[in-house]
Amino acid sequence: MYAIIKNGGKQYKVKEDEVVKLEKFDLGIGEKVEFDTVLMGQTAAGEVKIGAPTVAGAKVVGEVVEQGRHKKVKIMKFRRRKHSMKQQGHRQYFTAVKVSSISL
């Protein structure tokens, strides 16, 4: 059983009892979160439901387990023949959610 949800302009494939790192949102650790924008899902019986654009009445419930930052991504701009370069780093914030139930 799985579902494809939309969060923060991105799509994520989630399964029950799986921890997923999503875009950061302001909730404390241990709080419940509910996603209503389920784009597609598969039931335990194997039936696939596709939304247009979302599956009606479907929702994914999870619990926040961690707030953190990803590893650093280095951005480097190099100007050829000028002996000049610029280096910059970025660490994106995330919220880790453990999916507790999927209902389609």
Curated annotation (Swiss-Prot):
Keywords: Ribonucleoprotein, Ribosomal protein, RNA-binding, rRNA-binding
GO terms under biological process: translation
Pfam families cross-referenced by the UniProt entry: Ribosomal_L21p
Listed InterPro entries: bL21-like, bL21-like_sf, Ribosomal_bL21, Ribosomal_bL21_CS
GO molecular function: rRNA binding; structural constituent of ribosome
Transmembrane region(s): none
The organism's place on the tree of life at top rank: Bacteria
GO CC annotation terms, alphabetical: cytoplasm; ribonucleoprotein complex; ribosome
Entry-linked NCBIfam families: L21
Biological role: This protein binds to 23S rRNA in the presence of protein L20.
Sequence similarity: Belongs to the bacterial ribosomal protein bL21 family.
Subunit-level organization: Part of the 50S ribosomal subunit. Contacts protein L20.
Name recorded for this polypeptide: Large ribosomal subunit protein bL21
